[in-house]
């Protein structure tokens, strides 16, 4: 491969990564804005983030986590 081709490929990779990093930053800001809007309408952002994490778990893992949490709460009288 010639140096020109290698340079062009490298520039393309770098350009793609930079574009994706900017898109990621833009999306992150949009998510923050949505949480801020939800908060201004009285929603609990911390609870919403917890729900989002729980939704990522498969049903068996979620049931296992719920059972363990209930056991610990019962043990501690909470």
From Swiss-Prot:
- Origin: domain of life: Bacteria
Q: Which InterPro entries match?
A: GapR-like, GapR-like_DNA-bd
A GO molecular function assigned to this protein is:
DNA binding
UniProt signal peptide: none
What family is this?
A: Belongs to the UPF0335 family.
Known NCBIfam families for this protein? PRK13694.1
Q: What is this protein called?
A: UPF0335 protein A1G_00885
The organism is Rickettsia rickettsii (strain Sheila Smith)
């Amino acid at each position: 491969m010639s140096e020109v081709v290698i340079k062009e490929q490298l520039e393309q990779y770098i350009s793609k990564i930079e574009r994706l990093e900017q898109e990621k930053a833009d999306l992150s800001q949009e998510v923050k804005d949505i949480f801020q809007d939800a908060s201004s309408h009285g929603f609990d952002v911390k609870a919403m983030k917890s729900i989002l994490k729980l939704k990522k778990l498969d049903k068996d893992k979620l049931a296992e986590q719920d059972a363990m949490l209930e056991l610990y709460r019962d043990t501690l009288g909470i």
